[in-house]
Amino acid sequence: MDKLIKSIAKSGSFRAYVLDSTETVRTAQEEHQSLSSSTVALGRTLIANQILAANQKGDSKVTVKVIGDSSFGHIISVADTKGNVKGYIQNAGVDVKKTASGEVIVGPFMGNGQFVVITDYGTGNPYTSSTPLVSGEIGEDLAYYLTESEQTPSAVGLNVLLDEKDKVKVAGGFMLQVLPEASEEEITRYEKRIQEMPAISTLLESEDHIEALLKAIYGEEDYKVLVEEDLQFTCDCSRQRFEAALMTLSKSDLKEMKEEDHGAEIVCQFCGKKYQFKESDLEEMINDKA
């Protein structure tokens, strides 16, 4: 199972999250039948969302909306504090040739737009904040969001590597954050280490990429693992939820659906599961509105 490890430098000056999200992104690709570029863009967004949700407590949920004006359209992801995440990309069919180094192109097909984060604390008043997309590569956009919106200087690396058949080979990433206790000397040292760090794709290719990520972040400095959490792609859609959505329609709309379409089919955007509602189901809803 995928996992996220939270750690902190022994000095208390920095904290880091490292993630193995391979199965999460693999499941998303299978559910949406997404092609190469779309898979990488969606995968990076899911990983970013897993990081943001891991920052929360209780039963909070975090929604990430990467709203671009290019080929991908919008990417929407929702994660909770229990390691569950789901998401979809408007255009799952973007398949652009890789660069000479084998990297899948993402940024230009995200375009200009916003990185939006909605945090629902379960109180009925979700908090929304956003920053402009700085590159469309998702990792850089998350780092900018954390630094500008949450006022926490952060370094982020996210990626999804595909095999020769464009199936998910490995996915994961890291987030490193400066804590108030950090001295200027420590900040300079960590900045240098991050600048000299191997590419995230190289680290993910390592046999034990979780350990490789931790080693790249902390070097020879001591750190403490705080907690290890399981991660998974899970959709919480249900027939009851979509039935409730249908019940928000007017009586005339339900009648029109029953008489013209002889039923209704609703497809969950997050996982592709289909829910069928027969004429008799719609009739029952109409009667309930009487």
Curated annotation (Swiss-Prot):
GO terms for biological process: protein refolding. It comes from the Bacteria. Its main location: cytoplasm. Pfam families: HSP33. InterPro entries: Heat_shock_Hsp33, Heat_shock_Hsp33_C, Heat_shock_Hsp33_N. Under oxidizing conditions two disulfide bonds are formed involving the reactive cysteines. Under reducing conditions zinc is bound to the reactive cysteines and the protein is inactive. The gene is hslO. The keyword ATP-binding does not apply. Gene3D superfamilies: Hsp33 domain, HSP33 redox switch-like. This is 33 kDa chaperonin. Redox regulated molecular chaperone. Protects both thermally unfolding and oxidatively damaged proteins from irreversible aggregation. Plays an important role in the bacterial defense system toward oxidative stress. Disulfide bonds join 235-237, 268-271. One of its GO terms (cellular component) is cytoplasm. The keyword Transferase does not apply. HAMAP family: HslO. GO terms for molecular function: protein folding chaperone; unfolded protein binding. It is found in: Cytoplasm. Keywords: Chaperone, Cytoplasm, Disulfide bond, Redox-active center, Zinc. Belongs to the HSP33 family.
